[in-house]
């Protein structure tokens, strides 16, 4: 059975790129009759916050991405990770290192001066130092050949092992590091396919070596090319890299955002519109593009306009009242009014802003208009006539015609 996971660090809100990763992981699991799991990699004690955990959970819930089990918290598994790190040390797959910050700094400076890649040079690799409190444990990365895997999106990826150093698996304060903990948790959670951004490729090459020394089956990996901003550069808050719940606050529908996100790098025949239910049956990784996708505000607006107009007038009235406290149900022909506005609107917020004319009289400030007293009386008379008629096209045209003729306008 396929088991996927989404593993955010709760050091901030869920943004567009992370939401796409979560969606692809969820859809791949569902399309293969598998399980989708959620894991919070919350080992950064200073930056990980409960408010971000709650925000990520709320964002996934709004996007209809429901984990099949309760979330896993990496911070609660620290003792297990530490135990396995010590086991690797005892078996010779890791070693104790007592290098000081000063030594490491000098090492980096020397390498940079020689135009070499800054990395740990293995100074203590073969010294058989006895591990004690305050030291770090380093993973014995293979010295020769290459580390490689077949990516389900990008194809064969191979990097020579000399490009890697012996990365730390246990810090001097006794806490495990990300790459080690992530590998152990993927083993414990029985993850079969890891779907994540292509900025994790280096991490993957480290983690598969942890799997090997533990004699565990290596998961399949699929690395998603990044989402670029409209400028072609890395996505920023200015062009889409914002909290997913902000899209809701701006009046975007979750179904529209889901449809838009899945089309950021994935295609299926000539279709553009997909319900979540359909995606759960047809999604696959073979149709994911291996090139970066580009964020488009116009395309997102196009999708949202489509989904707004898929809704019935009653559904629109409900959503507008729920999210923006505007109740078209109070109007005599509110269903017709809201459907009319929705035709040209990109968001619920736009409908809300355009609806004010239905709920309040326009403010006409004749005092500051520079219009003479005689003209003011004419305008007020015209306003009063409009207030008294049934607001139908024929009556409006008749009143305007009589008014213009009466005042020679």
PLM features per residue range, with description:
Residues 8-14, 194, 402-407:
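A short glycine/serine-rich beta->alpha loop
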Residues 50, 54, 64, 184, ...:
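Conserved nucleotide- and phosphate/pyrophosphate-binding catalytic cores
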Residues 88, 139, 300:
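Conserved S/T- and glycine-rich ATP-binding loop of Class I adenylate-forming
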Residues 12, 17-18, 33-34, 64, ...:
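Glycine-centered flexibility sites
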Residues 95-223, 228-237, 243, 268, ...:
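Active-site cores that bind ATP or allylic diphosphates and position pyrophosphate for catalysis
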Residues 11, 19, 45, 77, ...:
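Short capping/connector residues at structural and topological boundaries
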Residues 1-113, 203-216:
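N-terminal Rossmann-like or analogous alpha/beta NTP/dinucleotide-binding catalytic cores
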């Amino acid at each position: 059975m396929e088991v996927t996971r989404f593993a955010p660090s709760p050091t901030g809100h869920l943004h567009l790129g992370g939401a796409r990763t979560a969606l692809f992981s969820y859809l791949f699991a569902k399309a293969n009759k598998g399980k989708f799991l959620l894991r919070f990699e919350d080992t950064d004690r200073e930056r990980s916050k409960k408010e971000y955990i709650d925000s990520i959970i709320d964002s996934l819930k709004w996007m209809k991405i429901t984990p099949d089990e309760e979330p896993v918290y990496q911070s609660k598994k620290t003792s297990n990770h530490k135990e396995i790190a010590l086991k690797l040390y005892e078996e010779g797959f890791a070693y104790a290192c007592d290098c000081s910050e000063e030594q490491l700094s000098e090492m980096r400076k020397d390498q940079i001066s020689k135009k070499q890649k800054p990395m740990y040079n293995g100074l203590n690799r073969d010294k058989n130092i006895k591990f004690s409190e305050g030291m770090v444990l380093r993973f014995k990365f293979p010295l020769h050949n290459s580390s490689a895997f077949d990516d389900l999106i990008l194809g064969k990826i191979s990097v020579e092992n000399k490009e890697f150093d012996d990365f730390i698996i246990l810090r001097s304060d006794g806490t495990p590091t990300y790459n080690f903990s992530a590998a152990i948790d993927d083993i414990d959670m029985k993850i079969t396919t890891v779907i994540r951004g292509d900025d994790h490729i280096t991490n993957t090459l480290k983690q598969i070596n942890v799997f090997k020394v533990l004699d565990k089956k290596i998961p399949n990996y699929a690395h998603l090319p990044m989402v670029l901003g409209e400028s072609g550069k890395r996505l920023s808050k200015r062009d889409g890299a914002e909290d997913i719940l902000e899209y809701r606050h701006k009046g975007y529908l979750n179904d529209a955002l889901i449809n838009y996100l899945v089309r950021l790098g994935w295609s299926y025949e000539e279709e553009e519109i997909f319900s979540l239910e359909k995606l759960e049956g047809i999604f696959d990784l073979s149709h994911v593009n291996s090139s970066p996708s580009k964020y488009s505000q116009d395309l997102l607006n196009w999708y949202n306009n489509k989904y707004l107009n898929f809704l019935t007038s009653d559904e629109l009235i409900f959503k507008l009242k729920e999210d923006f406290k505007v109740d078209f149900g109070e109007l005599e022909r509110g269903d017709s009014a809201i459907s009319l506005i929705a035709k040209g609107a990109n968001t619920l917020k736009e409908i809300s802003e355009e609806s004010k004319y239905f709920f309040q009289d326009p403010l006409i400030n004749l005092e500051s208009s520079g219009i003479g007293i005689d003209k003011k009386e004419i305008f007020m008379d015209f306003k009063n006539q409009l207030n008294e008629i049934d607001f139908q096209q024929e009556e409006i045209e008749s009143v305007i015609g009589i008014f213009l003729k009466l005042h020679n306008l």
